[in-house]
Every structure is written in structure tokens, then in C-alpha cells.
Amino acid sequence: MKIIKEAVAGTLESSDLLVKVAPGLPDRLDIHIRSEVMRQFGAHIRAVIDDTLGKLGVTEGDVTVEDKGALDCAIRARLQTAVLRSVGDVKIEWEKLQ
């Protein structure tokens, strides 16, 4: 799946995150993470992001995550929302997202 337009999901409130997605370079997926808890949970946050984007089939784009201590479920929900807003009419295999 390729991100075709810019989209945003989330907030910068405590225990939430802001996800911005935009078209990127061809055949390249760039992920940028800024988090208040990067030292403690950075690897886990990255794993959740990679897993969610993988299940959605995202292979191209620029993803920026500004985390304020969000739980895994919020990270997944915000990523899914931003990506689905950015791809237009694409058939989603919902069972893969569980």
C-alpha cells in the first residue's frame, strides 16, 4: 500500500500521540519517532509501528509519530486512521488488523 496524500490522526495531549503520514520517496518507507519515553520504550514503540504498518501493507511513505506516552492500542488506532485517510479507495483486509 502506498500513501498518496497527507493525513493526520491523534493529538499532542498526555497519553496520546500525533501521527502524520505523507507521500515519500519511491520504494521507501521512512519512519520518524519522537517520544517522551524513547529511552525506556523506544524499541517497543518502533515494533508496534512496524507491526501495524506491516499488517496494513504500507511499503512507501513518510510516517512521523510524536508520542506523549500512548499505549499500544492508541498507537495502532492512530496509525490505522492516518494511513486509511491517506490511501484513498483501497480494499482493506480487516481480519489482518486484529
UniProtKB/Swiss-Prot annotation:
Location of the protein in the cell: Cytoplasm
Protein keywords: Cytoplasm, Phosphoprotein
Modified-residue entries (O-(phosphoribosyl dephospho-coenzyme A)serine), positions: 14
Record's GO cellular component terms: cytoplasm
Coiled coil spans: none
Cited InterPro entries: CitD, Mal_deCO2ase/Cit_lyase_ACP
Subunit structure comment from the entry: Oligomer with a subunit composition of (alpha,beta,gamma)6.
UniProt xrefs under HAMAP family: CitD
Reported function: Covalent carrier of the coenzyme of citrate lyase.
Family: Belongs to the CitD family.
Protein name per its UniProtKB record: Citrate lyase acyl carrier protein
Organism: Albidiferax ferrireducens (strain ATCC BAA-621 / DSM 15236 / T118) (Rhodoferax ferrireducens)
Gene name of this polypeptide: citD
